[in-house]
Amino acid sequence: MATSHRVAKLVASSLQTPVNPITGARVAQYEREDPLKALAAAEAILEDEEEEKVAQPAGASADLNTSFSGVDEHAPISYEDFVNFPDIHHSNEEYFKKVEELKAAHIETMAKLEKMYQDKLHLKEVQPVVIREDSLSDSSRSVSEKNSYHPVSLMTSFSEPDLGQSSSLYVSSSEEELPNLEKEYPRKNRMMTYAKELINNMWTDFCVEDYIRCKDTGFHAAEKRRKKRKEWVPTITVPEPFQMMIREQKKKEESMKSKSDIEMVHKALKKQEEDPEYKKKFRANPVPASVFLPLYHDLVKQKEERRRSLKEKSKEALLASQKPFKFIAREEQKRAAREKQLRDFLKYKKKTNRFKARPIPRSTYGSTTNDKLKEEELYRNLRTQLRAQEHLQNSSPLPCRSACGCRNPRCPEQAVKLKCKHKVRCPTPDFEDLPERYQKHLSEHKSPKLLTVCKPFDLHASPHASIKREKILADIEADEENLKETRWPYLSPRRKSPVRCAGVNPVPCNCNPPVPTVSSRGREQAVRKSEKERMREYQRELEEREEKLKKRPLLFERVAQKNARMAAEKHYSNTLKALGISDEFVSKKGQSGKVLEYFNNQETKSVTEDKESFNEEEKIEERENGEENYFIDTNSQDSYKEKDEANEESEEEKSVEESH
């Protein structure tokens, strides 16, 4: 880790963009000097240094740490001034070998230095200081950092895997320049050998004493080298456009071409394509002999024949699959049956002898029978009148209640109560006028029977409007009754408060309800029995109606019967007319009149039955709509009243008979 960190640190310090020594600004890629020219300048400088080394070897070895190539240490030196990167980058293995050799040489020098230091201490008779490996490695690292030259260490950094980003930076910046330089300068191998020699000769003539010398000597040597520095020669950079700029310019030129040029090019291309077509010559083949044959007419005939045959086949298939409607076949059968019946009837009529009526006896035209009938009616009326008078004379009034014997009371108190009870409070009625009076009373107080009223049809559309109208009217009435007046005298409720009668006493809440008597219980039982009987009768009537409806023929059957009857009557009347017999003569003399009357009666009966069934159906629907309970209540009340009236009448008749 320490070695890799050290190498990375060296590379990071060496990766600096070159700076213009005059202006101090960083130099762009296209403004930099040519690396080959920089190498040539470096060679010249090295030659000068070698000459100086011959003259002053001590000064050159002492200043190795500050300036290796004779350039001022304060001036930024770019790696392109000394090394051509593509000449060295391809040999990583050689580079690592050289680095290992340098490391071994460095270790040897440090060992020598340690030995010299111990010898010096031994001479001075001083105990040696224990030096740890860490401090030794640090000292060796510092010495190596002093001795290492940044441009040379740059060559190692680009082959290391940890420094891929830094290498990519340089490669991307100089990948357009290096191929051109390799083409222009074939002296690549010579420069490569020079770089290798430079690396090999780095540790030659190395001496530790050069580092122990005074700083003055290094200062004087630096001043001398500053005087010998070459001046910076400005170079003119020729700007070259980028490939993308050239590409965009070509696109613009192509787009700037006029449409006429494009059309001309297209026309020229079309001409080139059409010229060989025009040059071709057409030569028609001879007409074949099959064309002159009348094949078309034969084909048309075959099509017509095929079409006709298909049409006939389809018609036959349709006729075979065709079936008449069922009702048509049924009507035809009925018609045939009727015709057969008429034929049989006419044959039977022809065979039978004609009817001849006997003459009416003369006794029927006499007056004896009528006189006898009238006399019998008179005798009957006289008998009824006489019987009525006898009944009236023999009738007597009801015996007095006091005359009837009563039970002997056990206690005297009960006897007093019974005497008080049997006191006559009203005079005896006139029994001759009682029936008429009762009839009047019953006719006045008898509750009329409620008749069923047909309701209109409840359609889904009509009730909405009527319900809304009723609600609006009810709201108006409620507002008129409850809301306050808006004008003087501002009476709070519009409806009049009900005036309470003075004679009406409030019924106390704590009073016990009346105890039912024996007569009330009997009445309730009678009402229940009558209701049950009425319900049974009602159920019986419903069942009878349902049976009638089930047994009754359907409407179309009745219509068919009626039509058949009318047709038979018409046929019969036509035959009579054809024979010269009138209908009146037949109705008077023959049995045909009775037959016709029977048919007419049957028709009237059927019509009445239809009407009755229709009315019964309507009544059933009304009862199903919710009137059954009301109907039962009213009928039960009527039956109960009728029973009471019948009982009263029977009691009155008994009283009249007893009085007579």
Curated annotation (Swiss-Prot):
Compositional bias per record (Basic and acidic residues), positions renumbered to this chain: 606-623
Family in the record: Belongs to the FAM161 family.
Short name of one Pfam family: FAM161A_B
Subcellular location: Cytoplasm, Cytoskeleton, Cilium basal body; Cell projection, Cilium; Cytoplasm, Cytoskeleton, Microtubule organizing center, Centrosome, Centriole
Tissue specificity statement from the Swiss-Prot or TrEMBL entry: Isoform 1 and isoform 3 are widely expressed with highest levels in retina and testis, with isoform 1 being the most abundant in all tissues tested.
InterPro entries on file: FAM161 (IPR051655), FAM161A/B (IPR019579)
Function of the protein: Involved in ciliogenesis.
Region: Disordered, residue numbers: 605-660
Extent of Acidic residues compositional bias: 645-660
Keywords, alphabetical: Cell projection, Ciliopathy, Cilium, Cilium biogenesis/degradation, Coiled coil, Cytoplasm, Cytoskeleton, Disease variant, Isopeptide bond, Retinitis pigmentosa, Sensory transduction, Ubl conjugation, Vision
GO molecular function per UniProt: identical protein binding; microtubule binding
Residue numbers spanned by region Required for interaction with CFAP418: 341-525
Coiled-coil annotated spans: 93-120, 296-320, 522-552
Organism: Homo sapiens (Human)
Any GO CC annotation of this UniProt entry: centrosome
Cross-linked residues, Glycyl lysine isopeptide (Lys-Gly) (interchain with G-Cter in SUMO2): 468, 484
Illness the protein is tied to: Retinitis pigmentosa 28: A retinal dystrophy belonging to the group of pigmentary retinopathies. Retinitis pigmentosa is characterized by retinal pigment deposits visible on fundus examination and primary loss of rod photoreceptor cells followed by secondary loss of cone photoreceptors. Patients typically have night vision blindness and loss of midperipheral visual field. As their condition progresses, they lose their far peripheral visual field and eventually central vision as well.
Protein known as: Protein FAM161A
Description of how the protein assembles with itself and partners: Interacts (via central region) with CFAP418 (via N-terminus); the interaction is direct. Interacts (via C-terminus) with microtubules. Interacts with LCA5. Interacts with CEP290. Interacts with SDCCAG8. Interacts with FAM161B. Interacts with POC1B. Interacts with CEP78. Forms a microtubule-associated complex with POC5, CETN2 and POC1B. Interacts with CCDC15.
GO biological process terms, semicolon-separated: cilium assembly; cilium organization; positive regulation of protein acetylation; visual perception
